[in-house]
Swiss-Prot record:
Binding site for ATP: A30, A31, A32, G33, S34, G35, K36, T37
Positions of the UvrD-like helicase ATP-binding domain: 9-480
InterPro entries in the cross-refs: AddA (IPR014152), DNA_helicase_UvrD-like_C (IPR014017), DNA_helicase_UvrD/REP (IPR000212), P-loop_NTPase (IPR027417), PDDEXK-like_dom_sf (IPR011604), PDDEXK_AddAB-type (IPR038726), Restrct_endonuc-II-like (IPR011335), UvrD-like_ATP-bd (IPR014016)
Entry function: The heterodimer acts as both an ATP-dependent DNA helicase and an ATP-dependent, dual-direction single-stranded exonuclease. Recognizes the chi site generating a DNA molecule suitable for the initiation of homologous recombination. The AddA nuclease domain is required for chi fragment generation; this subunit has the helicase and 3' -> 5' nuclease activities.
Gene Ontology molecular function, alphabetical: 3'-5' DNA helicase activity; 3'-5' exonuclease activity; ATP binding; ATP hydrolysis activity; double-stranded DNA binding
UniProt name for this protein: ATP-dependent helicase/nuclease subunit A
UniProt-listed HAMAP family: AddA
UniProt cross-references to CDD domains, sorted A to Z: DEXQc_UvrD (cd17932), SF1_C_UvrD (cd18807)
Complexes and interactors: Heterodimer of AddA and AddB/RexB.
Biological processes per GO annotation: double-strand break repair via homologous recombination
EC number, as in UniProt: 3.1.-.-, 5.6.2.4
């Protein structure tokens, strides 16, 4: 029985249905911005708080896609429970739920798998102390296992293995075959039964002598592709024929086009018969077009018709080269010849998998793939028919979980689906609740399988009468109507069953759910930039495109900010001016991000991007890694030269040349040794090299007995490189980078690997895989900046204004050009490779997979575009570059022809970029009428979507309009750089001379500090006395490597540290009576406990010196004082003339700061007392008598300033001023 929606509820009917429906498996197709997370949380809360049948939270399995999503889910549930508890404070059930929440199964599926394995490890013979391996550690272990396997196979001399090697390796190495083995193994792990899938691979190549191509298991994809191409050709030729009937059309060529159509129709009639097509396709010939000359023919229509025909001819040639360049028998023979090779490959992969699993077991490690498969092994057993059925462990979980709820179900893979089926109840019991949006399935590269979602969506019914219930949430509560209308307009034309994998029908369309105040400026804008043709190379074109797009976006952003574009603030329930933080730029991938950031910064636009790159390129990291490489093996020229040229050794190019000249052919290390052995070398250079070579030998010996992390730290200590980089620009970040390398080494030591060589290989694998620790960011995500991010990173987020850039960039289809392809359904497709002649060509399975995977990749790209467009709340910009505007528009017109909403499958299948999708769709909109839009049905033309299309040229996008004066300044700068005379310069000659002769009138004031401490003034006076000038900083001598600063070389406590310790004791000692020695010792111990003194300072204190102070006359005065103030701070302003008497024009005020050790008041007045720890005995010839005049002179300025400050504060003269010297117990009165 369904629960009726309460009156006043803000949930839509469909949302309410998703919240309360039960008793069957439920699939919720939640469109972008439809509130799916809120619905999921509400469903969970209602189950927990149900008055009649409440469910404990730990009896729900909630599976999320990321750890962050799981944490957010727990947080939301916790908040909802606390709110319920506030309304029902006496509820023990709610208190219990809050207590259970932390251990509830709300996590990623990997985390749930880990939980299952920890509980049932004994069922699959796994070490209970296992840990999850680092990805790089797993790869290195796999490499070792594979190397050992290949070495054994070579020793065996197995002919089948050698044939495999001959076909899949080069004459230099067998790395290609090793990569193939690992790739097939890893791909097999995406299947619930990896071994079964591997054994099926060779079946694809079963081709008996009587087999027909049409009977092969993959032929349906070839047949579909042939039909698609032929239909596309037919549509192009039909369109060309239609053009002949238009006024000004190429009427004489109608006969040509009719003949072409007749030939294509014959092919279409035979498209199910591969052999017949093989005979017919070569017979098709396109006759020479009849001439169309004269004013009666429209050149545009003539050219368009010819282009359509040429396009059809090219497609026919492609069809020939793909399928019909070889006979059907030759195709079948290739399969027969490759079958035993595939079988050998499968056996090799199986053996690798067995050994890899054994190696991981020995080291008690698992990887993420193992988590899923080990969990699957625990939850399933094979029945007599060999089918996987729930084990006792699975039955436990089926009983344990009242409901299994899966978020982002569209991103589930086949193994995860198998696990979910085992822990959920059977379909007729229905406790599986799945939420997702297949239109946002963008993780196929992680082997997600959107077809799982689609198959259920097609199978389930609205009322749940079948095997499950489907519920559509298509009301969007995020975006304005302009965003929704433009998205719907595009995707109704682009997303279909064949390209897109889902029909964008009425159920899939986004419906308006949000309420915004009116704003006429929110129509979707398409910014198209026409780039000059003929740019030198693809890389130059790419660079130019990103700069132009960045410049166009910067201009629009400035306009939005300047014109105070209004965005709606939901919290304030009012509109406000746009801020930079409201804007995001979305990219398919991040290679363009640095250039866009640079351009934005030049235009004064604050920008932020989470760039996780640049760490290994950082100079300090590169130098340290080079140093580690030559410690491992000094005979590596590039790393060695890098270290010698770096600040670690500090050679310049001339010095490197001198070394190389000693031995021009030997490795550089040998040349270095030759230079050291030579008697005629430069002494300074030789000394540098000797010291470095000595350190290199020391480090090599050190590396044998210490960890890599210890070695790195030893290098930092010996070279002082960590300290050195701290003084460079960005020093803190550079030091953090070096510490990160040390931390990376420590984490490496925590793996199953050891040693420097393996660590370097470990780092190389990280770099090969594109892993990067990244560099710290100067701007946080909370600041008012424009964000740059990938479309994948933006999933689940929303922004008031979205720029989707790079729409003209070609899709990455490089994987389709490999010599082999893998597919979960079809298996393994490979080129035929002749072992002797090295001739290769694609087999039919490879061609079939290429067509299938291309369609899947295009479908994924469409979904990525959908995600990008649906991030926008109020304003959407689409930005792209194109080369030839007129040609592009003509192509779009051709592709846009047709009366159906959905653009032809064939045209969409040819798309190479997002613009190839968007352009033809936009050509059918009324806003494109001026571009010669093709005739379409009124429903399309009158769609409510609003677009504004702007074509910009490169000239329009110069970095702010350059005025005439700016051009003149630029020309003069060029003349100066070239050494040419500047015309008209005499006009400014006098002004130039006056400016060059000008002298700053306040040079003396620049030497004056505006704030100075008393101690600094005392030291300044000492330097004046001893050296007669104020040069407190003197140049240091050049040193090899980096000399440790004197303060870092000090052993024990410095004089200043001892003085600080004595002052601390005098600040805290009780002043009621002379303390006993044991009392003083206890006081010192307490100061150490309170961390006011260190152990070293405690040990340095002479207790007798402190006790002797209280035997003096001034010490006794303290006991009878009315008031005692210790550590008295003061500020006082003096004229600069008093502080710097030698300066002529120094009349600026100077702030003087100081701290008085002790100020006390007796019956006869105030006394100032300062403690000194200067060494006297053993330093001065006549003891204190000889020291007194020197000490009096040294501290006279300080005491005078202290006295002046105190007398100003107390407004009366001091009775006495004294210094007490602990060394000897002497008092100096002033």
């Amino acid at each position: 029985m369904e629960i009726s929606k309460p009156k006043g509820s803000t949930w839509t009917d469909d949302q309410w249905k998703a919240i309360v429906s039960s008793g069957r498996d439920i699939l919720v197709a939640a469109a972008a911005g439809s509130g799916k997370t809120a619905v999921l949380v509400e469903r969970i809360i209602r189950k927990i708080t149900d008055q009649e049948r409440p469910v404990d939270v730990d009896r729900l399995l909630v599976v999320t896609f990321t750890n962050a999503s799981a944490a957010e889910m727990k947080h939301r549930i916790g908040e909802a429970l606390e709110k319920e508890l506030a309304e029902n404070p006496g509820s023990l059930h709610l208190r219990r739920q809050l207590a259970l929440l932390n251990k509830a199964s709300i996590s990623t599926l990997h985390s749930f798998c880990l939980q299952v394995i920890r509980k049932y490890y004994y069922l699959i013979d796994v070490d209970p102390a296992f840990r999850i391996a680092d990805q790089t550690e797993g790869e290195l272990l796999g490499d070792e296992v594979l190397d050992e396997l290949f070495e054994e196979e070579y020793k065996k001399g197995n002919p089948a293995f050698f044939e495999l090697v001959d076909r899949y390796t080069t004459d230099r190495h067998d790395l290609d075959l090793q990569h193939l083995v690992k790739r097939v193994y890893e791909f097999s792990r995406s299947h619930p039964d990896p071994e079964g899938w591997l054994h099926s691979l060779a079946e694809l190549y079963d081709a008996a002598s009587d087999t027909k191509v049409e009977a092969l298991p993959f032929y349906s994809y070839i047949k579909e592709d042939i039909a698609l191409v032929l239909e596309g050709m037919r549509q192009k030729l039909t369109r060309a024929l239609d053009l002949t009937k238009q006024p000004g059309g190429p009427a004489p060529r109608a006969e040509n086009f009719l003949d072409d159509l007749a030939q294509i129709d014959r092919l279409i009639q035979q498209q199910d018969d591969f052999s017949a097509l093989h005979e017919l396709v070569p017979t098709v010939s396109f006759q020479r077009l009849k001439p169309c000359k004269g004013d009666e023919y429209d050149p545009r229509l003539v050219d368009e018709a010819a282009d359509l025909r040429n396009s059809a001819k090219k497609q026919l040639e492609k069809l020939k080269s793909d399928y019909f360049s070889r006979t059907p028998e030759q195709h079948l023979e290739s399969l027969r010849e490759m079958k035993p090779v595939i079988q050998t490959l499968v056996q090799l992969v199986l053996e690798y998998g067995r050994r890899f699993a054994e190696a991981k077991k020995e080291k008690a490690i698992v990887d993420f793939s193992d988590l899923e498969h080990d969990c699957l092994a625990i939850l399933s057993v094979k029945n007599p028919a060999g089918e996987a059925v729930p084990s006792e462990a699975a039955k436990f979980y089926r009983h344990q979980f009242h409901e299994v709820l899966v978020d982002e179900y569209q991103d589930t893979n086949l193994v995860q689906e198998a696990i979910l089926k085992l822990v959920a109840k059977e379909e007729h019991e229905g406790n599986l609740f799945m939420v997702g949006d297949v239109k946002q399935s963008i993780y196929r590269f992680r082997l997600a399988e959107p077809l799982l979602f689609l198959s259920k969506y097609k199978r389930f019914t609205d009322d749940g009468s079948g095997s499950g219930q489907k519920i559509d949430l298509n009301k969007n509560f995020r975006s304005r109507s302009d965003i929704l209308d433009s998205t719907n307009f595009l995707f109704k034309q682009l997303m279909g069953e064949k390209v897109g994998e889902v029909e964008y029908d009425e159920q899939a369309e986004l419906k308006l759910g949000a309420s915004y105040p009116p704003n006429e400026a929110t129509k979707t804008e398409l910014l198209l930039i026409e780039t000059p043709s003929g740019a030198p190379g693809e890389e130059a074109e790419e660079l130019e495109a990103v700069q132009l797009e960045a410049r166009a976006m910067a201009g629009q952003i400035r306009r939005l900010i300047t014109e105070k574009f209004q965005v709606y603030d939901a919290k304030a329930k009012a509109s406000r001016n746009i801020q930079y933080r409201d804007i995001v730029v979305l990219l398919r991938s991040m290679p363009w991000a640095p250039q866009i950031m640079d351009e934005f910064k030049q235009q004064g636009i604050p920008v932020y991007a989470n760039l996780s790159t640049g760490y290994f390129e950082a100079t300090e990291v590169s130098v340290t890694l080079s140093l580690l490489k030559i410690i491992d093996n000094a005979y590596q020229d590039i790393p060695l030269a890098s270290v010698l040229r770096s600040p670690v050794v500090g050679l310049d190019e001339n010095e490197l040349s001198l070394i190389r000249i000693k031995d021009k052919k030997a490795p550089f290390y040998e040349a270095m040794k030759a230079y050291l052995a030579a008697a005629d070398g430069d002494e300074r250079l030789s000394e540098k090299l000797r010291r470095f070579d000595g350190l290199l030998k020391k480090w090599r010996a050190y590396a044998k007995n210490h960890s890599v992390a210890e070695l790195i730290w030893e290098i930092y200590r010996d070279t002082k490189y960590l300290d050195y980089v701290g003084g460079m620009p960005g020093g803190k970040q550079r030091q953090a980078n070096l510490r990160a390398l040390y931390d990376r080494a420590r984490s490496y030591e925590a793996t199953s690997f050891r040693g420097l060589f393996r660590f370097l290989r470990f780092i190389e694998r990280m770099q090969e895989r594109g892993d990067d620790l990244g560099t710290a960011r100067a701007l946080s995500e909370q600041e008012d900046v424009v964000r740059l991010m990938t479309i994948h990173s933006s999933k689940g987020l929303e922004f008031p204004v979205v720029f989707t850039a790079g729409l003209g960039r070609n899709f990455n289809m490089m994987d389709l050009n490999k010599s082999y392809l893998l597919d979960k359904e079809l298996g393994f497709g490979t080129k035929f490779i002749h072992p002797k002649w090295r001739i290769s060509y694609p087999t039919l399975p490879l061609i079939a997979m290429k067509k299938k995977l291309r369609r899947e990749l295009l479908s994924e790209e469409l979904r990525v575009l959908y995600v990008a467009l649906t991030r926008a709340k109020e304003k959407l910009y689409l930005v792209g570059t194109a080369k030839d505007k007129e040609k592009l528009l003509a192509d779009w017109r051709t592709q846009a022809a047709g009366s159906e909403w959905l653009l032809p499958d064939y045209e969409r299948f040819q798309a190479k970029s997002y613009l190839d999708f968007i352009g033809p769709a936009l050509m059918r909109h009324r806003d494109m009428d001026e571009s010669g839009a093709p005739p379409v049905i009124d429903e399309i033309r009158e769609h409510p979507a609003r677009f504004q299309v702007s074509w910009l040229s490169a000239a329009d996008l110069q970095a702010e309009a350059v005025d005439q004066a700016g051009e003149e300044r630029h020309d003069r700068l060029v003349q100066i750089q070239m050494g040419h005379a500047i015309e008209g310069a005499f006009e400014y000659e006098q002004q130039v001379r006056e400016r060059l002769a000008w002298s700053y009138p306040y040079k003396d004031a620049a030497k004056v500090r505006t704030k100075q401490s008393v101690s600094e003034m005392k030291r300044q006076k000492e330097y004046e006395d001893e050296y007669g000038d104020r040069s407190l900083i003197r140049p240091s001598q050049e040193a090899l490597l980096f000399k440790r600063p004197s303060f870092m070389m000090a052993k024990g406590l410095t004089a200043a540290e001892r003085g600080t310790a004595m002052h601390t004791v005098m600040q805290h000692i009780p002043l009621t009576r002379t303390p006993e020695k044991n009392e003083l010792s206890r006081l010192l111990d307490r100061l150490v406990e309170k961390e006011l003194l260190t152990e070293d300072q405690r040990a340095a204190i002479e207790e007798d010196d402190i006790l002797a102070f209280f035997d003096t006359e001034i010490g006794q005065k303290l006991f009878g004082a009315r008031r005692v103030e210790r550590e008295v701070p003061f500020n006082m302003t003096l004229s600069a003339k008093e502080v710097y008497p030698d300066l002529e024009s120094a009349d600026e005020p100077v702030l003087i700061q100081g701290i008085i050790d002790c100020l006390f008041e007796t019956e006869d007045g105030f006394y100032l007392l300062d403690y000194k720890t200067d060494r006297i005995h053993g330093k001065y010839r006549n003891g204190f008598e000889g020291a007194e005049p020197i000490l009096r002179k040294r501290y006279e300025t300080q005491i005078q300033l202290y006295a002046r400050a105190v007398e100003t504060m107390i407004k009366m003269p001091l009775k006495g001023r004294a210094l007490y010297f602990f060394d000897g117990g002497h008092v100096l009165l002033f």
